[in-house]
Swiss-Prot record:
Keyword Glycoprotein on entry: no
HAMAP family in alphabetical order: Phosphoglyc_kinase
Transmembrane segments: none
Cellular compartments annotated: Cytoplasm
One term under GO cellular component: cytosol
Binding site for ATP: 201, 323, 349-352
Metabolic or biological pathway: Carbohydrate degradation; glycolysis; pyruvate from D-glyceraldehyde 3-phosphate: step 2/5
Chief location of this protein within or outside the cell: cytoplasm
Disulfide bonds, paired cysteine numbers: none
Originating gene: pgk
GO molecular function annotation: ADP binding; ATP binding; phosphoglycerate kinase activity
Protein name stated in the entry: Phosphoglycerate kinase
Length: 396
């Protein structure tokens, strides 16, 4: 892909697709502006280069029609604060009003379009809507890695009509990190997969078995794997219909000589409650009336040892119900072990990213991805629609 820095943007209208799908409270105040901060380097560069910067994003799920609850106005205000310059807010994302606003822009001006999902054509990857977006710009920049797994009009079809397309700096960083970790990893390569459901991670597990030297499985999804090995997991959450698939993963790991690590002890309680009585037990001694809610201390040590000599680590999914302090120790221990390793480390997925921040080790992770679904699809070996679209339309 051609680098943004090789394109002359001075005086040009540049449409930047960002992901400003940020959490808002009841007063429409932003509670976490990480995604806005992540896009600032690209926007600042374009402003400094004298471009007329048109920023577009979605927010929430407004069902293809305007809804003031999902207005991007709060993000425009925050972006203006971060850039230390005014950011004008449009009333819509396409149409005569937007065209006239852009016509009045001077080099270095920034305009935020209203929520793309207020238009039904966005989610449908609609050609007419994509043409209307492309008509607003001379250069299209995609800096929204976190939505690059969705074939939406502003990510996919727009690249068919925009005169010039390029990835933004965040997109370049994301793809560079994943290229280093997944396409040409230094070995030993270890993947850590956690979270609640085998069903959501199964394609990733199946692909990772072709790539990794070691596979660590934790979180509630590990219960299904333990059950597949004949362990009685008490009242722990399992996906009965996927026990066969779990057995298949265990068998394939053995066939491919991938070291597979599962919990050897767990923290159990009779209910999901921060004040519930809890204890660490071996996985073969889980009480019939209890459920596993975190990995135990022996497992934390086992997983930590499996990471010590790793050269590449990719982690997606917590080891327990880490949002409750009572069941957070396992996830924090793994976060510390990942941070302590000498490996190139990539962490992604909302819960996992929150965990490394809460564990106080975020500054010692090589790369923290902004992508959730996009991160997972790369772990599945898929080509992301947004990335394929950029590759399809490149300046000669």
């Amino acid at each position: 892909m051609k680098s943004l820095k090789t394109i002359d943007v001075a005086g040009k209208r540049v449409l930047v697709r960002v992901d400003f799908n940020v959490p808002l409270d009841d007063q429409q105040q932003i509670t976490d502006d990480t995604r806005i901060q992540s896009a600032v380097p690209t926007i600042e560069y374009l402003v400094g280069a004298g471009a007329k910067v048109i920023v577009c994003s979605h927010l929430g799920r407004p069902k293809g029609k305007p809804d003031p609850v999902f207005s991007l106005a709060p993000t425009a205000r925050r972006l203006g604060e971060l850039l230390d310059r005014p950011v004008e807010m449009a009333n819509t994302c396409v149409g005569p009003d937007v065209v006239s606003r852009i016509a009045r822009m001077a080099p270095g001006d920034v305009l935020m379009l209203e929520n793309l999902r207020f238009h039904p054509g966005e989610a449908n990857d609609d050609d007419a809507f994509a043409r209307a977006l492309a008509a607003l710009c001379d250069v299209y920049v995609d800096d929204a890695f976190a939505v690059s797994h969705r074939a939406n009009a502003s990510v996919d079809a727009v690249t068919k009509y925009a005169p010039v397309c390029a990835p933004g700096f965040l997109m370049e960083k994301e793809l560079g990190a994943f290229g280093k970790a997944l396409e040409n990893p230094a070995r030993p390569f270890v993947a850590i997969v956690g979270g609640a459901k085998v069903s959501s991670k199964l394609p990733a597990l199946q692909h990772l078995l072709q790539e990794v030297d070691r596979l660590i499985i934790g979180g509630a999804m590990a219960n299904t794997f333990l059950a597949a090995k004949g362990v009685n997991v008490g009242k722990s959450k399992i996906e009965q219909e996927l026990i066969g698939e779990a057995r298949s993963v265990i068998r394939q790991a053995a066939e491919k000589k991938v070291e597979l690590f599962l919990p050897v002890d767990v923290i159990v309680a009779e209910k999901i409650d921060p004040d519930a009585d809890r204890q660490a037990v071996s996985v073969d001694r889980i009480p019939a009336d209890a459920m596993a809610l975190d990995i135990g201390p022996e497992t934390s040590r086992l997983f930590g040892d499996a990471l010590k000599d790793a050269k590449t680590i990719v982690w997606n999914g917590p080891m327990g119900i880490f949002e409750m302090e009572a069941f957070a120790a396992g996830t924090k221990a793994v976060a510390a072990a990942v941070a302590d390793s000498k490996a190139f480390t990539v962490v992604g997925g909302g819960d996992t990213v929150s965990a490394v921040h809460e564990a106080g080790v975020a500054d010692r992770i090589s790369y923290i991805s902004t992508g959730g679904g996009a991160f997972l699809e790369l772990m599945e070996g898929k080509t992301l629609p947004g990335v394929a679209a950029l590759e399809r339309n490149q300046p000669a």
